[in-house]
Regions:
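A short, conserved structural fragment
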Residues: 541-551
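Short, cationic-aromatic polyanion-contact patches
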Residues: 498-501, 550-560
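Class II aminoacyl-tRNA synthetase catalytic cores and aaRS-like
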Residues: 1-499
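Short amphipathic alpha-helical interaction segments
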Residues: 528-542
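Residue-level "edge-of-site" marker
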Residues: 28, 203, 536, 553-554
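Short amphipathic alpha-helical interface segments
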Residues: 497-526, 535
Length: 560
């Protein structure tokens, strides 16, 4: 426990001794939010707000503070004689001045006014402690010139402690507000067409509907293995068989695979299935939907993403899988067998292995040489049958399927088919997947005989699509990492880090960013006394977190 944490716990006990409950149970009747008070300012109006103290400037019998609520921040003014009308001034002198800290949450009753410099402010008539915080916020430091240091910007810390990220970085909350708006826009778009939102199982006896490595668990009562779903496709198609002609689900799916800036093992996808439609119809619906989302969120169809300008105005370009590969590699692979595909992969230095069949080899070529080329929305259409075990055979070419994927900024955003509804063909495709599994492909699909049985009762011609919502949200909010659009992305386990003081952490964090440097120059960047500095460096050396050495001219310090 740090010195600051000890002091806050002592203050907590002092509050209790004074009869103040630092964690009251009863509701606090908020009727105002910061941004509304600023945008609709009314002189001398009564207000009731609540929020977190983010800064304080105590000036004797008066004090300015900044309160942050869910909408923003507003300045508040504490005056001892306004708060303490009788001779007992302890509420201001003791509770406010000595026992409250930055980070504490309080409720305020007051009136609106403007300061001499015109800043909209709440004059505090009374306040109530709603939560005493026991850890200090890692607030940035600002020098006399207004330069900010030690901001809460380390990605590891931000993702691991999202609650602090939301408190300290207001723009982060904006991303997640937009995320909700995007999902609501999609839901409203589909509901207006009278499509039915449904729910299907997350725990499944067979992980079907996609080629991916699943997470496996065990049901103790039934003594059977179960899988976290990799897709809800097969269950949704069973609903189409049952006569629900247009169904969709916002589903949480799980794939036991790698993590990078575009992949998280737990992710959100929209899956939609509509009877009596085909993949051409689904392309039209998809571009209408995504254009609608862009306009609702940004007011226009063109947006800046990273350094690129992307136009979501429909219609979108279309190019076949084989034509795209020929365009960017020079190879016509449309009639190549598995051995020929493996050879050209080697010729182009594309990493492959013996478990990869024809479909995965083609996918490797496209992924390595083509997909990053598509910046504006582009439909890649007409995939080989070997890549698409759940897709209907192409109406004019039996070697292809009626499938498209939507690529934007080099990322796959959507995957759609004219759905395979021939049960005999579907079983043969599943059996081919089984053979790939025997060769070592751990992403090959399982055979789902109940799904085959449902198709044998008859599924109408159907088109289906899955849209990766996390990636779509990345694009719409100009974020280049999927972790930025997930409240709590999956993180690597923490190492057992040694316990050190907050000041030692500040020194270590700064040193880790700088690397090896001159000891005395580095020391001059802090305001610590010589005694304090010696104590901190000793603390870090004992924990083997830094090392200090000497060359011919200088004393050097570096992180271990």
């Amino acid at each position: 426990m740090t010195e600051q944490e000890k002091i806050r716990r002592e203050k907590l006990e002092e509050l209790k001794k004074l009869g103040v409950n630092p964690y009251p149970a009863e509701l606090f009747p908020i009727n105002n939010f910061s941004i509304d008070l600023i945008e609709d300012y009314k002189e001398n109006s009564k207000v009731t707000i609540a929020g977190r103290i983010m800064s304080r400037r105590i000036q004797g019998n008066a004090s300015f503070a900044e309160i942050q609520d869910s909408k923003g921040r507003i300045q508040v003014y504490f005056n001892r004689d306004e708060i303490c009308k009788d001779n007992d001034k302890s509420k201001y002198n003791i509770i406010y001045k000595k026992l409250l800290d930055i980070g504490d949450i309080i409720g305020i009753n007051g009136r609106m006014f403007k300061t001499k410099v015109g800043e909209i402010t709440v004059l505090v008539k009374d306040f109530k402690i709603l939560n005493k915080s026991l850890r200090p916020l890692p607030l940035p430091k600002v020098d006399s010139d207004g330069n900010e240091y030690d901001s809460f910007s380390d990605l590891e810390q931000r993702y691991r402690h999202r609650y602090l990220d939301l408190i300290l970085n207001s723009q982060v909350k904006d991303i997640f507000v937009k995320r909700t708006k995007i999902i609501n826009t999609i839901r409203n778009f589909l509901n207006k067409k009278s499509y039915l939102e449904v729910e299907t199982p997350i725990l499944q006896p067979i992980p079907g509907g996609a080629s991916a490595r699943p997470f496996i668990t065990h049901h103790n009562a039934l003594d059977i293995p179960l899988y976290l779903r990799i897709s809800d496709e097969l269950f949704l198609k069973k609903l189409i068989v049952g006569g629900l002609e247009a169904v969709y689900e916002f589903s949480r799916d799980f794939r036991n695979e790698g993590m990078d800036k575009n992949h998280n093992p737990e992710f959100t996808i929209l899956e939609l299935y509509v009877a009596y439609k085909d993949y051409f119809w689904m392309m039209d619906l998809t571009e209408s939907l995504i254009e609608k989302v862009c306009i609702e969120l940004n007011g226009k169809t063109k947006i800046q993403y990273d350094s690129k300008l992307i136009d979501f105005k429909a219609p979108y370009e279309k190019i076949s899988m084989f034509d795209a590969i020929k365009k960017f590699t020079g190879y016509d692979i449309s009639r190549m067998d598995e051995n020929e595909l493996r050879k050209i992969c080697n010729d182009m230095s594309i990493e492959v292995d013996e478990s990869m069949g024809e479909g995965k080899l083609i996918d490797a070529i496209f992924g390595s040489k083509c997909e990053k080329k598509f910046i504006n929305p582009t439909f890649i259409i007409d995939y080989p049958k070997s890549m698409s075990p759940l897709t209907k055979q192409h109406r004019s070419n039996p070697n292809l399927t009626e499938r498209f994927e939507l690529f934007i900024n080099g990322m796959e955003i959507a995957n759609a088919y004219s759905e395979l509804n021939d049960p005999i063909d579907q079983l043969e495709r599943f059996e081919n997947q089984l053979e790939l599994g025997k060769k070592g492909d751990d992403e090959a699909m399982f055979i789902d005989m109940d799904f085959i049985k449902s198709l044998e009762y008859g599924m109408p011609p159907t088109s289906g699509i899955g849209i990766g919502l996390d990636r779509l949200i990345m694009l719409m909010t100009n974020q280049t990492s999927i972790q930025e659009v997930l409240f709590f992305p999956q993180m690597k386990p923490l190492r057992n880090e040694p316990v050190i003081s907050n000041d030692a952490k500040i020194v270590l964090n700064k040193l880790q960013k700088k690397g090896e440097c001159d000891f005395n120059i580095f020391k001059s960047e802090f305001d610590f006394s010589n005694k304090k500095w010696d104590k901190l460096t000793k603390e870090l050396r004992v924990k083997d977190l830094i090392s200090i050495s000497k060359n011919e001219n200088n004393l050097l310090i570096k992180p271990s």
